[in-house]
Amino acid sequence: MKFADGFWLNQRGYEVNYANQAFEIEEIENGFLVVATPFVVYNRAMMLGSANLEIAYTSTQENCVKVSITHHKGHVDNGPHFVLEDKGFKPQVTVTDKEAVLVTGDTKLVVSKENWSFTYYYKDKKLTSGGWRSTGVIF
């Protein structure tokens, strides 16, 4: 679906909010949770009424990273539901003031706190990355 009109304009009727800052990063089971905001936030009050995204990066198997992006959690869960194999794998998670790192086998994910960017590595070789306008929500 085309929602952009050229490179910098949006089509009429669409409001697009891109992640611009990793405001908060919290370590969770098997990974970390990022609260991404569409603009630079200096305090929690600035987040009211904005299109904040919760992005969970987790890993339950070696060299596999699961990414879940949520804008609104309130919904009826009608499935489908599948039983996933859990081998008890625990990735290495490091959260610092500047970045969060998830290491699962030979795969590494680095999320920057200063501006919105994430990079995937495999055996210390850069696979792919995302930054400005890579993650967002469309109304």
Residue ranges and their predicted role:
Residues M1-F139:
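N-terminal accessory segment at the very beginning of proteins
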